[in-house]
Every structure is written in C-alpha cells, then in structure tokens.
Amino acid sequence: MEERIVSAEATELEEQSEQGLRPKRLADYIGQETVKHNLAVFMEAAKMREEALDHVLLYGPPGLGKTTLAAIIAAEMGGELRTTSGPAIERSGDLAAILTALEPGDVLFIDEIHRLNRTVEEVLYPAMEDFCLDIVIGKGPTARSVRLDLPPFTLVGATTRAGMLSSPLRDRFGVMARLEYYKPEELAQIVERSATVFQATLEPSAALELARRSRGTPRIANRLLRRVRDFAQVGGEAAISLERACSALEQLHVDPLGLDHIDDKLLKGMIEKFNGGPVGLETIAATIGEEAATIEEVYEPYLLQIGFIQRTPRGRIATPACYAHYGVEKQNG
C-alpha cells in the first residue's frame, strides 16, 4: 500500500515522536467531551471506593487518541502503564508473564485487542473477571490446574474494529467508549498546542486551515503541521501564515477537504470510467491498482463519512456532493 500523508495509521517514527505531544492529564485532553466526562466520573468513583477502575474498551477509527487516553487513565489512577498489542501476544504463556508482573493498580493496555488469538483470549477471562490466572502444570494424566491470584488491575483494550471482538471478551469490559472524529475547532486547538511544543509560531487562521484538512484526526493534523513547519522554516519565515499553510498543503497534494491524490484517483475513476457507478469493489481495485480490502478498510471510511460515495447492493456510487467537488455534471444514460 502506498504511503500517504493523510493516513491515520502511525509510522514507527511517529509513535516515538508523538510521546512529547500527548497530554498527561484528562483536563488537558482536547475533544471527546462525553468520553472524558464519563471517564472522569468512573475514575473518581473507583478512587473513592479504593478499587481498580473497571476494564475499559476504547474503539473507533485510528489516530483519535486511544493510546493517549490509556496513558491518562494510568496517570489519573496512580498506576503504571504496561503496553502491548494483540499480535505481540502469540501464546498464553506470553500473556501469563505479563499478567503476573503487574502491580496493584497498574493499567494493562492492549492495542489491536481484536487480533488476540482465542487461546490467549481465554486466559484473559478469569484475569478480567476474578483477578486470577489458571495455569496447567505438567502434561498428560499428571497435569493439574493451579489458580494464581493477580493484583487488582485495569485492562484498557483499544480497537478500530469492535465488531471483530468475541462476545465473551466484549462483555467483560465494564466501560465501553467510542471515540469520534474531531471538529475543526478542536483540531485547531490541538495543532496550536503541538506548535507550542515544536516551538513554532502558528497563526490561528493557519491552525484552522490545517485542522480542516486533517480528516477529523489529530495524528494527521500533527503530521501536516510538521511538514508545513518544514516549508516555513526552509522559506525563512518566522511564523506559519495562512498563505504558507495553504501553499505547503497544495505542494503535499492535500486539498481543502483533506483528500489526496489517491482519493482523487479513486473518485475520478468512478466518475470518468463508470459514470459514477454503481461499480463493484473489485473493479475499483483493479482500476487503481490496489487491493479490495485496502480500499474498503483504509480509503472508503473517510469518503463515506463526508458523503462522497455510497455503498449499495449493486456496488459503489459517487454522490452528487462528489460530482460538485470536482465540478463535473453526471452524464445521463
């Protein structure tokens, strides 16, 4: 898959650099007001009862702050954050080692929790429900099961695909929170905060322009800010102006709606080659030289969100809003 500046997935380098941009406390976390309010209540109640916070499932599109929220929960509850991911836990023994190393009040963050295999998942059930771990000692007829007590802890699971979680696992989360795309005003605040961390001067109008082109996603907003800052710095400009932001974003092929050249290729292909559809997913994939699964999981969600395409039983259709964006009239017949 081609690397895109508007991808919501983090690169390895970004995962490291994002650490300095992440707020440490819930009060400093911008956006997601309903989730924030509810978490604040649940955490305060748990502290009053001197209990571990109920297990939390954070779900929603990538790049919206699930990892950041997990770190904030650990900080607010006074525990250490232990981080891993679904694909990294290959065997039940791997998970057992992680669980037995936890201290009381720790937060175990499992990213991409939907990718846990079923054998590992079953080890989690008693750990989440009763804070205990069942392990089998020996083999064959002499094998016996031993139950180990675990300290009270909070599991925070993150997923972009909540529907792929098994019912038994999903039902063991006491708190479920969906993270939504951000409003431009919220993203502008995030961009301004990041600019301060970068020691860059950013005009408010430039911050809002970056926000509008960031697909409602903080990770994309921060990535665009870094690149626009590069253009301003090389251009010898003391501050990032609206004019500089627009010019740099055009150079990066990110249009006012946050669409890039791949979006253009997909949408224009539907309009010009198939008269707006309906056209099958496999046909679109062959036309733009991409895998059907990638189109469905990576490219389409934002295009659906802004109302540029529709999914129908007969295939994908380009909407009137899509035609209007490109200044094209739909051909009859």
Curated annotation (Swiss-Prot):
Stretch list, region Head domain (RuvB-H): 256-333
Protein keywords: ATP-binding, Cytoplasm, DNA damage, DNA recombination, DNA repair, DNA-binding, Hydrolase, Nucleotide-binding
Ranges for region Small ATPAse domain (RuvB-S): 183-253
GO MF, one annotated term: four-way junction helicase activity
Enzyme class, spelled out: hydrolase
Catalytic activity from the UniProt record: ATP + H2O = ADP + phosphate + H(+)
GO cellular-component term (any): Holliday junction resolvase complex
Position of the signal peptide: none
Pfam family, one: RuvB_N
Annotated residues for binding of DNA: R311, R316
UniProt binding sites for ATP: L21, R22, G63, K66, T67, T68, E129, D130, F131, R172, Y182, R219
Family per similarity comment: Belongs to the RuvB family.
PANTHER family linked: HOLLIDAY JUNCTION BRANCH MIGRATION COMPLEX SUBUNIT RUVB, PTHR42848
UniProt free text on domains: Has 3 domains, the large (RuvB-L) and small ATPase (RuvB-S) domains and the C-terminal head (RuvB-H) domain. The head domain binds DNA, while the ATPase domains jointly bind ATP, ADP or are empty depending on the state of the subunit in the translocation cycle. During a single DNA translocation step the structure of each domain remains the same, but their relative positions change.
Protein's name according to its UniProt entry: Holliday junction branch migration complex subunit RuvB
Annotated organism of origin: Shouchella clausii (strain KSM-K16) (Alkalihalobacillus clausii)
Gene that this polypeptide is encoded by: ruvB
